Amino acid sequence: MDCGFCTVIAGALNNFTSSLEEEEENYEKMNRYHPLIRYQLGFHAEYTISEELLTGLAKLAARYRAPVYTHNSETAREVEECRLRHKTTPTVYLDSLGLFEYGGGGYHCVHMSREDLRIFQEKKLYAVT
């Protein structure tokens, strides 16, 4: 396909419709397809994916030295529910699993703490709003 503009596709790994194997297959296949097409590792959101899949995705990101993208802190409820599950914010939790070692970013990022912002700055993460 020759479209003449750059396209970036981010993965949406989750507990329901995809697997680590599919994520890796998409990453390898699409990043070889055309120089103007890039595939970035990603998952839907902290609340739609298991810690086991997140840990696997962090290993995949390390293998490819690749950034990871996700929906992050879109609503106050999302952040509060993450605090109940993991005793911290989505950003801190995901960073603790090694997901941002090679950069990446979050979509929305509306309800961020000072610590979240520090992590975004330190890891050079992007906020896509």
Enumerate the language-model features and the residues they cover.
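Active-site-adjacent C-terminal substructures of enzyme catalytic domains
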Residues: 99-129
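Metal-coordinating catalytic core of metallo-dependent amide/deamination hydrolases
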Residues: 2-110
